[in-house]
């Protein structure tokens, strides 16, 4: 039976344990996700407290991290999602906020023009990030947000 958190505290505490173990064991997110059948993005988000993991995956990553049975159970619990009460001051996270501040209304206008009145699901959703060479030198981040369009329905 699925269980659900009504507080962020249990997952925040577990996330700290995950990060400590990951660092101590010199593991990567890709290494933790390897062989689970889930994407590195999903497993990373789950280990950072944003998704539950299936039991088999929770057991695999907990073993890799050296976590106990209580951690395996908590990794399967549906979390209280979202961990930012206000705008984060972390520069990487803030840049995403800034992108939405600058391009949010443009994205909204283009989504509505191309799809109609509705939203892009963050539930039926995939996220990918790739590092590519910049022709002008350096590297670029290519981030793909792939969500199902859900139209509003009159009733």
UniProtKB/Swiss-Prot annotation:
Keyword Kinase included in the entry's annotation: no
Function: Catalyzes the reaction of cyanate with bicarbonate to produce ammonia and carbon dioxide.
Family: Belongs to the cyanase family.
Protein name: Cyanate hydratase
Top-rank taxon, per record: Bacteria
EC code(s) of this entry: 4.2.1.104
GO molecular function, one term: DNA binding
BP GO annotations: cyanate metabolic process
InterPro entries referenced in this protein's UniProt entry, alphabetically: Cyanase, Cyanate_lyase_C, Cyanate_lyase_C_sf, CYNS_N, Lambda_DNA-bd_dom_sf
Keyword Calcium part of the UniProt annotation: no
NCBIfam families for this protein: cynS, PRK02866.1
Catalytic activity: cyanate + hydrogencarbonate + 3 H(+) = NH4(+) + 2 CO2
Family annotation (Pfam families): Cyanate_lyase (PF02560), CYNS_N (PF21291)
Keyword field: Lyase
Active-site residues annotated for this sequence: 95, 98, 121
Entry-linked SUPFAM superfamilies: Cyanase C-terminal domain, lambda repressor-like DNA-binding domains
